[in-house]
Amino acid sequence: MFRLRLVEQPMPTGSKDTQVLLEWLIDSLSLVRRKPESWNTNDEPSALHRMFTGSLLKEPLRGWNTKELGDCCGLSQTAMHNQMLRLRESGLVSSELKGRWHIHVLRGGSMANAVELLGVQARKILDIRLTELSDLIIDSEERMYTDSEDEERRFKIKIAEPSATIDGKDRIDSLMEDLGLNGERGKSEDDLAKRITIELSQSHRPITLLVLAERLNETRSRVQRVIERLLEMSIIERVAMPDRIAQDVYLCLMRQFDARGEEWLVTRGGLGRLDTNITKKIISGIKKKNLSIDRVQGILEDVEIENQKLLLNTLGGRMPYGFRIAGKNGDEIRERVLNRLDRTIRRLITVAKRIDDSLEV
């Protein structure tokens, strides 16, 4: 069964070193479980690296059995079985049974061909899975009223073809598991990722982390871990919540007026940066004790959103942020995620071609 875990990484710009390029490819395909930043060019190559350079890259279509591959990299047959299973699932290597040995070849006869084949499979399978996800997402123009933050995270996704439905579960549970949203050590009875995905998919407005935790009766840290995975997959995005600014500004104004007084509000509190009439209305409302959230919202209506953010910040508050599905419907999400996948696959193909070229020198 096809299973692939992709991690987008900066290109090894200009490098023609086979070792550097191959380790970059191995890390991008998550074939070795380690932190990419923990490896540098002075470290000893991984066992998988030694296996590729000692066999499959030298003679990709010769047909190598597991014992020969193990001899190249110094791994036991059990360890090699696990490595080859992962390579077959990722689509880099194909195998056939000859006699009592499984014979392995690099697909397509070169690293570039193998990665291109892998990319075609990955895109089609992800398209199928995103179509399943699209069925959960309700159409909503309102959801996208506010511009998203200009932040792009490193793309990280698990792609797996549809697996069998788990006993006592439904297809959504299988989808969450196959996309890796339950985490690597998720328990079978844990459906938090499913509940969060459904909650966001059915919402017309961004939802804060705190609100999600309260609605689902879960700890904030557990909810945050699932949110991080959804962000890395580009399914959701973080967005400012301007409709909450008036509420937070009001609370900060009242707190700071009681603690520091009018002069501080006008000077260091930021009211002095606003139009004089706006400042007077706010101060007057505080003194007369008739200021409310609705009045603050009306007073700040003509103030640019960036200046509202600045005011909240100088008053000691923080801009409220929430999370939303990153599109008005399922089709937009599908296109968004596939575009990120296409970019990652293009990088993989470019590096794979460089690996092939470096071997010819």
Model-derived segments and their meaning:
Residues N42, L56-R62, R86, L200-R205, ...:
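Short helix-capping/hinge SLiMs at alpha-helix to coil transitions
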Residues R220-G285:
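Internal, charge-rich low-complexity segments
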Residues P10-M51, K156-R195:
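Short alpha-helical segments that sit at the start of domains
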Residues P60-C72, S203-R215:
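Short acidic, hydrophobic short linear motifs in intrinsically disordered regions
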Residues N113-A160, R260-V361:
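Amphipathic alpha-helical dimerization/coiled-coil segments
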Residues G74-E89, N217-E232, R238:
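Short amphipathic alpha-helical interaction segments
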Residues L85-E89, L97, R107-A112, E116-L117, ...:
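DNA-contacting interfaces and partner/effector-binding or oligomerization modules
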Residues L97-H104, G108-G109, A240-C252, T314-Y321:
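Short, Lys/Arg-rich nucleic-acid/phosphate-binding segment
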